[in-house]
Amino acid sequence: MTGKPEGGAAIPLRVHDACFTSEVLGSLKCDCADQLALSLDYIAGPGAPGLVIYLQQEGRGIGLANKIAAYALQEGGLDTVDANRALGLPDDAREYSSVAAILADLGIASVRLMTNNPRKFIGLAGYGLEIVERVPIEFPPNPCNARYLRTKKEKLGHLLERV
């Protein structure tokens, strides 16, 4: 967190889910590490306060072991959504009650949410959080993640303009 929220003004918020494969191993199969870096830079910049909440919800909430199993199925031709389904897992298993609790504890009721994911927007709004603006965090696809990002746009409704 940078700065101290005052007067109920909407602060920039990034709710970021762990991505060991990109953030630690440097995988290019997604844009998670890029999104985290951009969010940290944005929030550290002028106009503080801002907040990044980092959650341990690897692989859209299915966990690291299941994510690796899904990667193996993707190498065999399935996309990210169909790979989860083939493993009997949900498309997205993340939940945001802890975020609502953190924000309530900090006295934050209004945010400018940094996301491309409409489910995250809806999930947080469901806890009574006022989201006054969606701040996109998008990068041009690379050869390793273009199919993944296209699938997220087409099957999960992600708000991606460069795909």
Predicted regions: what they are:
Residues 1-163:
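Catalytic domains of riboflavin
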